[in-house]
Design a protein with these regions (language model features):
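N-terminal topogenic membrane-targeting module
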Residues: 30-114
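Compositionally biased, charge-rich terminal segments
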Residues: 1-21, 69-83
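Membrane-proximal soluble helical/coiled-coil segments
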Residues: 80-161
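Short helical patches
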Residues: 5, 9, 16, 27, ...
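A transmembrane-helix-recognition feature enriched in membrane-embedded lipid enzymes
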Residues: 8-46
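Low-complexity, compositionally biased segments
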Residues: 42-43, 55-61, 123, 173, ...
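Cytosol-/stroma-facing membrane-proximal "stalk/adaptor" domains immediately downstream
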Residues: 133-208
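Acidic-enriched, low-complexity/disordered segments with a strong bias for Aspartate over Glutamate
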Residues: 18, 22, 39-40, 52-58, ...
Length: 208
């Protein structure tokens, strides 16, 4: 694996902290939702770490009421604002706010001149057709370094998908000259932490 020792330590820290909070979410979220009103868009401030990322879909905040897909397929308005719908959403999308706005990378804090992309920047969209990898590193304005590592390992009709560090694949291929193209108005303002290994994904020949 193309990770440096410091990056491995960063990853271990992320996993330990987030794993603890994810376990706590099963206790905290059911209680926190008792303090929410129907028209609320967020959990009470003291519980904010346990809501999903504060992203907007169709002009509506997804923090506790779900994104557009959730509203379309599972709980259409206004049923998405019921206790049950919110509970299911938050237990499915645990500590998104923490992973995004506390430990995540704020796009405005990235030094565009520091971005380095190694490997195939399009690896995330090949549907597992070919094995490969991409690693993106950057330095924040405060000097801290962040990385995102994505790897696909194909075997037969299936493949293993690995994504570690921060979701920097969103800026794969970016540099000081084109960075603004990766930070449009409707783009996410924070890039989450990630530690995901899916060993059994079916190859999609369409590359999706």
């Amino acid at each position: 694996m193309m990770l440096k020792s410091k990056e491995i330590l960063q990853l271990i820290t992320i996993i330990l902290v987030e794993l603890l909070l994810e376990l706590l979410a099963f206790v905290v979220v059911p209680v926190a939702l008792l303090f929410c009103k129907k028209d609320d868009e967020n959990l009470p401030k003291i519980f904010r770490w346990f809501e999903d990322a504060n992203d907007y879909y169709d002009g509506k905040c997804a923090a506790i009421n779900g994104d557009s897909g959730w509203r379309e397929k599972h709980y259409p308005e206004p049923t998405n604002r019921t206790y049950k719908a919110r509970l299911l959403w938050l237990l499915r999308n645990r500590i998104g706010h923490f992973s995004s706005e506390i430990l995540g990378v704020k796009l405005d804090d990235i030094n565009p001149y520091s971005i380095e992309t190694i490997g195939d920047p399009n690896i995330t969209s090949n549907g597992g057709k070919e094995s490969g990898f991409c690693k993106v590193t950057c330095t924040l304005k405060d000097g801290k370094k962040r990385f995102g590592f994505f790897r696909v390992v194909r075997y037969g009709k299936f493949y293993c998908r690995i994504y570690l560090g921060w979701k920097l694949m969103d800026i794969a291929g970016a540099n000081a000259l084109n960075f603004k193209e990766f930070t449009q108005k409707d783009d996410k303002k924070h890039l989450k932490t990630v530690w995901c290994i899916n060993p059994l994904k079916k190859v999609n020949q369409k590359g999706e």
